[in-house]
């Protein structure tokens, strides 16, 4: 009799544990995978961490800091560090100063992404880029800028939805269009390229369209001495749509305009006004 009760109890216990296990798996399946680390960190979306059941990593507490009882306002905190060693032999065919030991390029960034409900967003990314050990010191523009805001912008969302959204972005921002062959944040060097200006981001069905007008940021080597370049203006429209019949393929349509007041040519210095249309 006792053994019969034991078997019955074990049977119902296994049923309960199985149901609880299924419920747990179902809850986990509703949580999306964490986003990949993007070249532009503002493209990472951690809003899914609003659901406490989706928090699986100790760092998730920094990726979603709840502000307010409703949870539709939150702060994301992140950062990255890059150490890059370069060494050359017979640089420029041995002409000029040579460096037999190489040099170190170090870049450290921290950022904060503040979402005020669904319509307003503030994003700021503070960066320190320094060079150590290079014969002749850091190269201008690309090697060193001790402390500066590489990005500091506000987003205003005019329309929101999976099939149709419109965002206006104001402030300092990085651009990365299409595959990055024409316009990218210049990740290869130590000091990345940013722009001060305005951008409109429109997503309709499978189209991603971005219109912008901005000035490139000219970095100094010190602290907070980055400012827009008064001699250059950059504007345009860039549209991207995936091609479903080609795996990983896209179609890009773009117009880019560039005005340089003091462009350097072989025969002198003058204004350059360039218009580029392509696909």
Predicted regions and their residues:
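N-terminal secretory signal peptides that target proteins for export/translocation
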Residues: 1-8
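Transmembrane beta-strands of outer-membrane beta-barrel pores
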Residues: 81-89, 126-132, 172-176, 204-206, ...
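Residues on the lipid-exposed face of transmembrane beta-strands in outer-membrane beta-barrel proteins
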Residues: 79, 110-114, 151-156, 198-202, ...
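Bacterial N-terminal signal peptides
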Residues: 9-21
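Signature for the C-terminal beta-barrel architecture of outer-membrane proteins
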Residues: 162-168, 181-279
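N-terminal periplasmic/intermembrane-space "pro-region" immediately following the signal or transit peptide
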Residues: 21-100, 111, 117, 139-141
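Surface-exposed loop and membrane-interface regions of Gram-negative outer-membrane beta-barrel proteins
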Residues: 87-106, 116-166, 181-184, 222, ...
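Short sequence motifs at beta-strands and strand-loop junctions characteristic
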Residues: 71, 100-104, 143-148, 190-192, ...
């Amino acid at each position: 009799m006792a053994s019969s009760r034991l078997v019955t109890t074990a049977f119902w216990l296994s049923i309960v544990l199985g149901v609880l296990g299924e419920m747990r798996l179902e809850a986990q399946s509703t949580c999306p995978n964490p986003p990949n680390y993007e070249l532009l960190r503002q493209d990472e979306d951690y809003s899914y961490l609003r659901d406490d059941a989706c928090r699986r990593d100790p760092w998730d507490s920094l990726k979603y800091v709840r502000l307010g009882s409703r949870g539709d306002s939150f702060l994301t905190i992140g950062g990255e560090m890059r150490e890059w060693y370069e060494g050359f032999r017979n640089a420029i065919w041995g002409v000029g100063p040579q460096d037999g030991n190489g040099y170190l390029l170090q870049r450290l960034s921290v950022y904060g992404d503040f979402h005020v409900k669904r319509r307003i967003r503030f994003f700021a990314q503070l960066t320190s880029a320094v060079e150590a050990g290079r014969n002749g010191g850091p190269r201008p523009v690309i090697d060193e800028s001790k402390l500066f805001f590489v990005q500091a912008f506000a987003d205003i969302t005019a329309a929101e939805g999976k099939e149709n959204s419109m965002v206006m972005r104001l402030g300092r921002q990085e651009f990365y269009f299409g595959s990055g062959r024409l316009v990218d944040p210049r990740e290869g060097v130590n000091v990345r390229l940013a722009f001060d200006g305005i951008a409109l981001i429109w997503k309709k069905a499978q189209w991603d369209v971005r219109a912008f007008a901005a000035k490139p940021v000219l970095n100094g080597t010190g602290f907070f001495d980055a400012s827009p370049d008064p001699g250059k203006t950059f504007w345009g429209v860039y549209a991207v749509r995936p091609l479903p019949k080609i795996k990983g393929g896209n179609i890009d349509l773009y117009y880019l305009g560039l005005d340089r007041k003091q462009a350097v040519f072989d025969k002198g210095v003058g204004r350059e006004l360039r218009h580029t249309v392509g696909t």
